[in-house]
UniProtKB/Swiss-Prot annotation:
It catalyses: fluoride(in) = fluoride(out). The keyword Calcium does not apply. Keywords: Cell inner membrane, Cell membrane, Ion channel, Ion transport, Membrane, Metal-binding, Sodium, Transmembrane, Transmembrane helix, Transport. One of its GO terms (biological process) is fluoride transmembrane transport. This is Fluoride-specific ion channel FluC 1. It is a multi-pass membrane protein. Fluoride-specific ion channel. Important for reducing fluoride concentration in the cell, thus reducing its toxicity. Na(+) is not transported, but it plays an essential structural role and its presence is essential for fluoride channel function. The gene is fluC1.
Amino acid sequence: MFNTLLAVFIGGGVGSMARWLVSLKLNSASAHLPVGTLIVNLVGAFIIGLTLAFFSRMTHIDPVWKLLITTGFCGGLTTFSTFSVEVVYLIQEGKLAWAAGTILLNVAGSLAMTMLAFILVNNFASQ
């Protein structure tokens, strides 16, 4: 149990620091679209897709590694709460089209990235 908690703790810390750095560098790139939040959510969705597809085929690997990457790193990297508050700010500023676009890009984009990761792993594994 301690190893599992430690793995999630380490992964979460690294993921959170990565999110902060990406947001720090990219969120100021656009006055309307929180680019940093979008990037971390898309990258996190892709990484979790890769990880889950990989671990579903490699069942002999200790599942603590999966938790380090998925619950820890991806949980720390991605952010639904920041995404939500950024959308609320856009709505409060009357930027309804930007709010809708942000929702669409984050939700549909994250789903597409996760699906793409599964497809890539499955195609690579079948060759």
